[in-house]
A protein has these predicted regions:
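Low-complexity, intrinsically disordered terminal/linker segments enriched in charged
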Residues: 160-195
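Sec/Tat signal peptide C-region and signal peptidase I cleavage site
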Residues: 16-20
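Surface-exposed, charged secondary-structure patches
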Residues: 101-142, 195
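A mature extracytoplasmic/lumenal domain signature
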Residues: 95, 121, 135-137, 148-150, ...
């Protein structure tokens, strides 16, 4: 799934320890240089050492995702509210594992592509933002929108990435919904945990 590769690669470029207070577009822009430099300087280790790769995904990417909000969205309100609190926690942990594995597969695919940010327009809500960009590839352009939500401490976390109209979370939600309808939530959690 080529688009998923780009979604992941693009997000990784913007994941950084400075992803905190301030305008979300500023932090996304500042992160590009830091992460692309890290990837360039550590390409061999990222390619050859799975433990190093996993630790970098845990350090650079996962803390920047709003796993709880993502979990609610991919399951849908009905499924989320039907689960007990321990089941929700278990699902979040399994979904987090899926994110780690997914980003591990794509971290090394960055090849110096350029990204241009469109002018940021603040929305009606101060706690939600959408940052638009264009990812310049050899094959053409990809339009990328980042959906972010401000957490309780005032930092921003990404909860969805949309590339050329395709939402990462909508894709997962569609897959998960089909699985839940066929086999139930417990089966989905078990499958996420076993991969």
């Amino acid at each position: 799934m080529k688009i998923l590769k780009y979604i992941i690669t693009i997000f990784i470029l913007f994941s950084s320890s400075v992803f905190a207070n301030g305008d979300p577009d500023t932090f996304l822009k500042d992160s590009v240089k830091e992460i692309s430099t890290f990837i360039s300087e550590n390409k061999e280790s990222l390619d050859s050492d799975e433990n190093f790769l996993r630790s970098k995904v845990d350090e650079l990417v996962i803390p920047k995702l709003d796993i709880e909000l993502m979990s609610k969205i991919v399951l849908g309100k009905k499924n989320w509210t039907s689960m007990s609190i321990p089941e929700r926690k278990e699902f979040q942990l399994a979904f987090r594992g899926l994110m780690v594995r997914t980003y591990m597969k794509s971290l090394t695919s960055f090849d110096g592509e350029k990204i241009e940010f469109l002018p940021y327009k603040k929305g009606k809500r101060n706690d939600v933002a959408r940052v638009k960009s264009v990812y310049l590839l050899k094959e053409g352009e990809l339009h990328v929108n980042y959906s972010l939500k401000m957490n309780q401490s005032g930092g921003w976390k990404v909860y969805d990435i949309n590339i050329d109209g395709i939402s990462l979370l909508r894709n997962y939600r569609s897959d998960f919904k089909s699985h839940i309808e066929r086999e139930g939530i417990r089966s989905l959690i078990n499958e996420l945990q076993s991969n």
